[in-house]
Amino acid sequence: LKNNINYSHIPIILLTARATLQSKIEGIELGADAYIEKPFSTEYLLVKIATLLTNLEKLRKAFTSSPFVEARTIALSNADEKFLDKLTETIKKNISEPEFNVDILASEMNMSRSSLHRKIKSIAQITPNEYIQLERLKTAAQLLQSGNYKINEICYIVGFNSSSYFAKCFQKQFGVLPKEFCSSIRN
């Protein structure tokens, strides 16, 4: 299941009678997120599920709120990681194009718009439009960190047509204005 791009984002818990260390290792190597032996406590299972989901949500929040957390941190499987790598690469290739949108992204990913929406939403809990904008802003943060460009230049490099809209989006995403972000990096 973890190798199938349609199901790779779903956490897998193995409930099994096999209790050997080798069986546990095989289960985890095959992509299981947890391995629970029978007989098991229902309370333990519920706590394990809640913990897996809470940890996944923390990773997603870190990904969307921190400019330097990469997309692959929210991948639950190799298939998700490959998908996110290709997605990020495709966006970065077109990042300076203001008219780059979900339709173009879906076409370049060889997916329908609805399939792309479902997949991104299931992995990152954001829409494809939000994902494109997030990648634009993360790239802007990296460029700001480099110190090689002015804020006005960066806004156009990452595909924004307006520096004021760029600053507003940057602040909404990361909690600081680009100018404040630059100051915090230098200090």
Model-flagged regions — what are they?
Residues S23, F40-I49, K61:
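C-terminal output helix
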Residues S122-N161, S183-N187:
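Terminal helix-turn-helix DNA-binding modules in bacterial transcription factors
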Residues V102-Y131, I157-E180:
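Basic/polar phosphate-binding segments, predominantly the helix-turn-helix DNA-binding elements
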Residues T88-F100, I120, A124, A141-K150, ...:
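Basic, amphipathic alpha-helical hairpins
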Residues I36-K38:
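A Lys-centered signature of the CheY-like receiver
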